[in-house]
Structures are given as C-alpha cells and as structure tokens.
Regions:
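Flexible, low-complexity segments enriched for small/polar residues
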Residues: 2-28, 278-317, 325-443
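N-terminal accessory alpha/beta regions
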Residues: 14, 26-139, 222, 228-229
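Short, solvent-exposed loop/turn and secondary-structure capping segments
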Residues: 29-32, 55-59, 122-126, 158-164, ...
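Long, well-ordered, tryptophan-enriched scaffold segments
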Residues: 65, 198, 203-266
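Glycine-rich, acidic and aromatic/proline-enriched surface loops and short helix-turn segments
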Residues: 104-121, 153-157, 185, 210-214, ...
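Short, conserved phosphate-binding/catalytic loop or strand-edge motifs used
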Residues: 125-134, 153-158, 173-182, 304-308
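Activity-critical C-terminal alpha-helical subdomain
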Residues: 155-223
Length: 443
C-alpha cells in the first residue's frame, strides 16, 4: 500500500468510494459520469463545481426591521433580537448551497471547521458567523498557514475563545492554549511537568502575549485586504510589546514584540511561521486529513508510508491543502488497492455523520428542498423546523455548534471515533430522517 497513484478507470465501485469520501452526496448521473474517468479527471470535475444557489441566506423579515438587520450592516444596534434564529438561517443557507452542488471544497470547509472549531451559539452576533463561514469557504482550497493567521483576527473566533479579553496587563490564555493544542501543532506525549514534547506551558504563556490586544470590531468596518471579509482590530496599547522567548520545543526562539499595528501583525505572522516550520505541525494536519477522508486509525506502516510522506509534501507545498488532498484521494492506499489484509479495510470503514447522512439521503430520494425565493414558508419548515431544530439536535450533531472546542467526539475521541454517531439516544433520528423524506412528514 502506497501513495502511488491509482491510474485505471475508476468503475462504479471505486467511483462510489471516492464520491462518499470527497463529497457529502452524489446522484446516479454523477456516479456514472465519474465511473468512466480516471481519478485525476474525477478530482478535476469535483473541484470545479462552484454553483452558488444563493449568495446570501434568506430572512423572511424585511431588512429595515431590526430582525432582518444582520448581514451587511456596519452598525451594531444595542438590541439585535433573534440572533440564535439568524445563526440557524446561516447554517441552513450553507447546507442548501452544499446539497445543490457536488464540490470537494464543501467537504474541505467542514474539515476546516473541525480543525479551527467554533460553536455558532457562542460567538456573538450572527453576522460574525456569516463572516466566519465565508472565511472557511475562502480557504477551503487554500493555505492552512495563512488561515491560521487570518482566523486569529476573525471576530467569531475572538469572541468564542475570549481572546478579545486578552490584554497585556490581564492575559487570557484560552485562545493561545487551543491554538497550540487543537488548531496547529497539537499536544504530543507528555515528557515532563507542563512539557508536551511539541510545546510547553511556557509556550502557552508566550503565545497569549503574542495574541494580546486583538479585539472584536463591532461595526465590521475593518476589511481584510486579502479576503475582503471583515476582521477584528488591534489595540496597540493593550498588546504585550515585550520580547517573547519560547521553550526548547521551538528551539528557544525569540520574537520581538510589535509596537504598532504593522509590527504587531508581523509579530503574529512570525509566530505562526515558527509553529508551521515544525514537522509535528504538518503531521498533525495530515493525521486529521487522514482520519477525515480515509479511516479513524492507522498502523505503523501507514504512519511510515502514508502519514509522514504526506506531512513532508505539505511542508514542501508551504501548507497548501489541495495538493495533499489530491495525492491522498488518488493513491492506491485510498482505494485499498493490492491490500490482502481483511482486517485493514478502508472502503466502507467510516460511519456517515448525521450531516453526510442527511445530504446523501436527500439526493438519493431526489428530495427537492423548497427554494427560498419561491416557497419561503416550506423552505423554513423543512430547513429550520425539521433539520435545524429537530433532526440535527436529535442526531447528536448540531450543525456548526459542537459542545466543546475539541469538536464532535466522533471526529477526535479514541477509541470509538465515528462509532460515536451511533447510540441509543441518536439512532432514532436516523430512522426518522428516512421516514420523513419518504412520507413528506417532518418529525
């Protein structure tokens, strides 16, 4: 088993496997189209569908009403009611667009959500969530290192992990800790008190100093020049301007503190570059990609022949995500080609998440979600009342709203991983989904 490419025509069986892993859904037309292609041609096709059914979510209330005052406004009125409902509209807007196209970038966007996790109910105003989704969409075929820089000034993230409260004289380490432990290099084997081999508690303290003074911008009037998306602000007088010295895990690297907005941004970029220069960071991302697209566990041989070479490729490509995903999804290993071990199956080894189950069932039954512009009432009844308020909570996967910053247990928690999707409390939602799509009764 290796990263050598699978070069034959896919055929129906391997086309199904590729589509199940790379997309949230497919139909018979796409399946038979893909089955006659080789994997490179198939991936070209699956990266090319950029259909956007609706550029913005529909809100039934007029924009001049406070209830509809939420997406493009640069003001922040003191009373913005129904923010939970508006965040629900946003998650269902993304779902509607995803179901109406076949694009690997939708799967990659959700991968980025599982990597740089927020919970939409804990980020403040709904338009912050809108900007956050657009940021993930922007980087769904982009650069992981650049996303790590940009997301630090994302208003939703600043609120979610309290970094907007992080000041030089009153440090808050929440974001710094999760940035190292979950978002980038991840925690390695503990080799001493406060020493996790990949970073130390001292590095968390230093990282919090780097992140100090980054604040939410309530009116969203600062626009990132690269993404065109609103970002937070830098409070120079609340930033720790001292020199930061990191531990042996980062070769005792010294980082000069910024003293104005430009040098503070340079300090942030240098800090992120320091982390991404480490092989452990590349291995962490590749391990997550492998678990997301291939299977939840792997052998020592997989580590040596798949994970480590892909990690080096990720570094060589300066953390561009698409080349790594293409290498993995086109490999003989991904298709279980030439593997005689019956206990090491890749095809059929991942239990569908409630999100993928819903999307795939909608396409399988050729269920047409009502169009918001033509049938707004039925669209809301299905998208909000059934999916958002009923199916997803009952299934154990509230969309873009995991219970903790670590994400859904099925994504990361050993030894069960994706088996977490099946429990006595969540299995009924799967049965009811099928029944509802067949009968048209939303339960």
């Amino acid at each position: 088993m290796s990263l050598l490419p699978y070069t034959s025509e896919l055929g129906v069986s391997k086309a199904k496997h590729l589509l199940r892993r790379s997309c949230f859904h497919y139909n018979k037309t796409l399946l038979y189209q893909i089955s006659s292609l080789n994997v490179d041609q198939a991936l070209d096709l699956l990266f090319s569908d950029n259909t956007i059914s609706y550029a913005q979510p529909y809100d039934p209330l007029p924009t001049e009403s406070p209830h509809g005052y939420w997406l493009e406004s640069t003001e922040y009125p003191p009373d913005m009611p129904n923010q939970g409902r508006k965040r629900g509209l946003l998650s269902q807007w993304w779902f509607y667009n995803m179901v109406n196209r076949n694009n690997i970038k939708d799967k990659l966007l959700f991968f980025l959500h599982t990597t740089f996790t927020i919970s939409s109910g804990d980020i403040g105003a709904s338009h912050y969530f809108y900007d956050h989704l657009r940021l993930l969409q922007y980087f769904s075929s982009g650069n992981l290192k650049e996303l790590a820089k940009k997301i630090t000034l994302d208003n939703a993230m600043l609120n979610y992990l309290d970094n907007t409260q992080n000041n030089a004289n009153n440090p808050n380490e929440n974001y710094a800790r999760e940035f190292l432990e979950l978002f980038t290099i991840t925690k390695g084997e503990q080799i001493g008190e406060g020493d996790y081999s990949t970073y130390t508690e001292h590095d968390v303290i230093m990282a919090a100093k780097v992140f100090s003074g980054f604040k939410t911008k309530l009116d969203r009037s600062i626009i990132d020049p690269d993404t065109g998306i609103p970002i937070g602000r830098i409070s120079v007088n609340q930033h720790d301007q001292s020199t930061k010295t990191f531990s042996h895990a980062f070769d005792n690297y010294q980082l000069s503190g910024g003293t104005d907005e430009n040098t503070i941004m340079s300090e942030l970029h240098e800090f992120v570059d320091m982390i991404f220069d480490k092989q452990a960071t590349a291995r962490a991302y590749v391990s997550k990609l492998y678990r997301f697209f291939v299977k939840s566990e792997w052998t020592a041989d997989d580590e040596a022949n798949i994970i480590n070479p892909l990690a080096q490729q990720l570094i060589d490509n300066n953390y561009e995500i698409v080349p790594i995903v293409r290498t993995l999804l086109s490999s003989q290993h991904f298709f279980d080609f030439g593997d005689d071990d019956p206990n090491d199956e890749i095809v059929g080894s991942i239990i569908k998440s409630p999100l993928q189950l819903a999307a795939s069932m909608i396409r399988t039954f050729e269920f047409i979600i009502p169009e918001p512009s033509e049938d707004l009432g039925n669209y809301y009844r299905f998208s909000m009342y059934f999916l958002r308020n009923n199916y997803f909570p009952m299934s154990g996967m509230e969309l873009f709203a995991p219970e903790t910053v670590a994400g859904h247990p099925a994504i990361y928690q050993s030894p069960d991983f994706d088996r977490h999707w099946f429990s006595s409390s969540t299995i009924l939602a799967r049965y009811r989904l099928t029944e509802s799509l067949i009968t048209g009764r939303n339960k």
